[in-house]
Amino acid sequence: MGIFSIANQHIRFAVKLATAIVLALFVGFHFQLETPRWAVLTAAIVAAGPAFAAGGEPYSGAIRYRGFLRIIGTFIGCIAGLVIIIAMIRAPLLMILVCCIWAGFCTWISSLVRIENSYAWGLAGYTALIIVITIQPEPLLTPQFAVERCSEIVIGIVCAIMADLLFSPRSIKQEVDRELESLLVAQYQLMQLCIKHGDGEVVDKAWGDLVRRTTALQGMRSNLNMESSRWARANRRLKAINTLSLTLITQSCETYLIQNTRPELITDTFREFFDTPVETAQDVHKQLKRLRRVIAWTGERETPVTIYSWVAAATRYQLLKRGVISNTKINATEEEILQGEPEVKVESAERHHAMVNFWRTTLSCILGTLFWLWTGWTSGSGAMVMIAVVTSLAMRLPNPRMVAIDFIYGTLAALPLGLLYFLVIIPNTQQSMLLLCISLAVLGFFLGIEVQKRRLGSMGALASTINIIVLDNPMTFHFSQFLDSALGQIVGCVLAFTVILLVRDKSRDRTGRVLLNQFVSAAVSAMTTNVARRKENHLPALYQQLFLLMNKFPGDLPKFRLALTMIIAHQRLRDAPIPVNEDLSAFHRQMRRTADHVISARSDDKRRRYFGQLLEELKIYQEKLRIWQAPPQVTEPVHRLTGMLHKYQHALTDS
């Protein structure tokens, strides 16, 4: 595909974006808003943001959800701005500095919450800063400005949603149905690989791909949930399917690991059975029916526990899959599956990374303030706003540097594009609302196509161009003001990029170590006789951490294997029949405290000391299990866990 080519699948969204911009423009001028530009800018960003993230037309519900987050973020930012102004109106410099800290605080929170919701916090940070900077000449107009800004943004969001509904957005339901079928086949093929016990790298690639696909399916579930309330039943089933899919991966990989030491556990009956190739979900269905008969014939005791658990999870997966595809009423059997264990939420491992983001945003905003006060430049405030926007939005993404470069390219492209609109197009269309709408629709159409291609600078160019062309009521054409605004955007982006380069983020290794120690803590916490604790479902949280580890350290197989081994140990110990008595219960609490100390230790020396203490406690615990005559289902997993911790002691403790 050529650089300027237009693919058929890109046209519908481009028309949708153009319609959203035109609607916002028309409504803004019709209701005599003072700055319709904010409504147009909001409509463009809300519609184009999900398309840029998806690399194509976003699925149904994505634009609505982003609009909802933008409303929340705007209201939080407006309230924070009003509070800061009321409290510090007599100290303008202090007021701006507090706003810089507020922007950093919001970036810190956005780095810790779910990526889907982080947009609202990033927006809240720079909205307060925009209000404080804008009202500097007339602080008494703060409430009026806040209300007007909220109104304009709500109008822009409503226009984006109307355009989305007008052009029948894509439903993700068919994609979900296809992925459910394909994922079941892939799960069966992984079990075949694990029973064959072939090349370890092939198995690693297979389970790694399945972890990514299961995570992607969870993202599809979120999209389906946003799409319509009629998918509520399918959403409940998909949530349970997520846990079942992770269970299937865990049981398959444990089957592979067991054969490293005890290959005789997997009998020839099962090896021959899993030799049969499968291509479709129907093939898997037939094989599972035969497999259940084989287990009924051989007996549960003669069946390896991993295969027995895998078949049970696959059968439940099949049952819920049919329910998702048909979206029928949930029956009693499904309800029993859905009433599963409560999911556990883990503490974020990226606290140091979040603190780096806090300092990046705060320092860049303070640098912008100093630049503005030192130069006295009329567009210093515009540069400061761009600094806050770039840092607030870039920090929550995996590669902030590339986001800043995207904004720089976008603001550079916006200068000649905005110049064309400011000097030629808008003055010649000022007397005709129709011509003005057509001119902006053309801009939205072509940039909408580039946004879907994820062209570097396209998103920044769309927002920056709309921001600098005259869309105020009434329109005034001052070239010096236009040039100041355009240059202010460029300078702000360059300053933000400079701060991102200077304040290095070296938290990657620390995050990896914290994640691995959280896996260890989870495995240790599974050693308990508390019934409520044993019923907690840690699996989704553990695999979410594993997915983060895979993204932070792509290709680092030893780390992935260690994490997966800890997950397997957690699942095996969770189901182990540990003897119930006060002596063991007290020791379980002691080991959990020590594991928590390992995670929270701030220095390598403390971490090594606590880790050594944990290893000593595990040694004592094994002796206690022998005294209390614990069965092999308990002693063997504990022995394997202790061996793994001894083997990887340095990787888990050293920076």
UniProtKB/Swiss-Prot annotation:
Quote the subcellular location field of this record. Cell inner membrane
Going by the entry's taxonomy, the superkingdom of the source organism is recorded as Bacteria
- What are the UniProt keywords, alphabetically? Cell inner membrane, Cell membrane, Membrane, Transmembrane, Transmembrane helix, Transport
**Which GO molecular-function terms appear in the entry?**
transmembrane transporter activity
> Any one cellular component term from GO for this entry?
plasma membrane
Enumerate the transmembrane spans. Answer: 13-33, 38-58, 69-89, 93-113, 121-141, 152-172, 370-390, 407-427, 431-451, 459-479, 482-502
Which biological process terms from the Gene Ontology are attached to this UniProt entry? Answer: carboxylic acid transport
Q: How does it sit in the membrane?
A: Multi-pass membrane protein
User: What turns on this gene?
Assistant: Positively coregulated with aaeA and aaeX by AaeR.
Please report which protein family the annotation says this sequence is part of: Belongs to the aromatic acid exporter ArAE (TC 2.A.85) family.
> Which PANTHER family does the annotation name?
MULTIDRUG RESISTANCE PROTEIN MDTO, P-HYDROXYBENZOIC ACID EFFLUX PUMP SUBUNIT-RELATED
As for what it does, the entry says:
Forms an efflux pump with AaeA. Could function as a metabolic relief valve, allowing to eliminate certain compounds when they accumulate to high levels in the cell.
This one is known as p-hydroxybenzoic acid efflux pump subunit AaeB
Say which species the protein is native to: Escherichia coli O6:K15:H31 (strain 536 / UPEC)
